[in-house]
Design a protein with these regions (language model features):
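N-terminal cap/lid segment of alpha/beta-hydrolase-fold proteins
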Residues: 1-37
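Short beta-strand/loop motif that positions the catalytic acidic residue
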Residues: 200, 206-208, 212
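Mobile cap/lid helix-loop segments that gate and shape the active-site cleft of serine hydrolases
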Residues: 54-55, 149, 156-196, 202
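Short substrate-entry loop that stabilizes the transition state in hydrolases
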Residues: 38-40, 45-87, 160-161
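Alpha/beta-hydrolase fold nucleophile elbow
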Residues: 117-132
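Short glycine-enriched nucleophile-adjacent loop
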Residues: 106, 135-146
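C-terminal catalytic histidine-bearing segment of alpha/beta-hydrolase fold enzymes
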Residues: 221, 228-269
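Alpha/beta-hydrolase active-site loop
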Residues: 92-116
Length: 269
């Protein structure tokens, strides 16, 4: 990882623009490092879909990253490939973005606690937080990696790629989906994280607004029930009156619950 520039210094943390390599691509993002000696548990904050033409590194999820930094977490917020100024690269089924996260996890595990940008990172305590598209990417990550201790899924896309494809077609009036030509059903089943939940080792915290008109709340309900049936450590919350991105008191309650979840899973051990 490389620090490109300092973006902001607050009373609680320092925010820097960072880059890291991922399969030959350069991925940008920001990192919030709390004041103090550390080591600090690490949380990767994964943003939802924003039109790349209007995307800014300090996007809407910055407030969630900052709240975690103020609570004593070293937060890394990657832009993902194909979101500027990161390089462009393959992303079919959004596997490419999951690869970026997996490479970032590997980097934290290798460089955390060592001299350099991640010296204050605790590589043994790592969580991920994903909203919408980022929540879908998080599901893929926790089904293939045991390097994540805790995962927050917030208004998350489905682990069933057929459902995601249909939803994206709906939003784009049939212009685009996750693929141009539908893969065979057996391939679709193999690439869908929903079919590999038995591999999840992370504790999971699911949050969804019951007035979400973007991602159906039923998708989170289904995921919650599947994880419970597998006896996985999971907690599930529905937020009355809240849309896809929370506001007001519901947003503050969500931030509080996330902090308590990560404190329990990443700081107590």
């Amino acid at each position: 990882m490389r620090i490109e520039q300092t973006l902001n210094v607050t009373d609680a943390f320092t925010r820097t623009l960072v880059t890291f390599p991922s399969d030959g691509l350069t991925i940008y993002g920001f990192m919030d490092v709390p004041r103090g000696e550390g080591p600090f548990p690490v949380v990767l904050v994964l943003h939802g879909y924003v039109d790349p033409a209007t995307y800014n590194t300090l996007t809407y999820t910055t407030r969630y990253a900052d709240a975690l930094a103020r609570a004593g977490y070293l937060v890394i917020h990657p832009n993902f490939r194909n979101w500027p100024p990161s390089d462009n690269g393959p992303e079919e089924y959004r596997v490419g973005q999951a690869v970026d996260v997996l490479n970032l996890i590997g980097l934290v595990k290798k460089q955390g606690g060592q001299p350099g940008p991640l010296q204050q990172a605790d590589p043994e305590h790592l969580g991920i937080w994903g909203h919408s598209m980022g929540g879908g990417i998080s599901q893929r990550v926790i089904t293939v990696s045991d390097g994540v201790d805790a995962a927050v899924l917030y208004g998350a896309m489905s682990g069933d790629e057929a459902l995601n494809h249909q939803r994206i077609l709906y939003f784009t009036n049939g212009v685009s989906g996750l693929w141009d030509e539908a893969p065979p059903d057996d391939v679709l089943q193999r690439i869908s994280p929903i079919n590999y939940l038995d591999r999840v080792t992370a504790a999971v915290s699911i949050h969804h607004g019951d007035q979400d008109a973007t991602v159906p709340p039923a998708w989170s309900d289904d995921l919650c029930q599947r994880l419970q049936a597998l006896a996985k450590p999971v907690e599930c919350f529905s937020y009355p009156g809240q849309p896809h991105t929370f506001t007001g008191d519901g947003d503050q309650l969500f931030i509080q619950r996330v902090r308590e979840f990560f404190d329990r899973e990443l700081k107590a051990s």
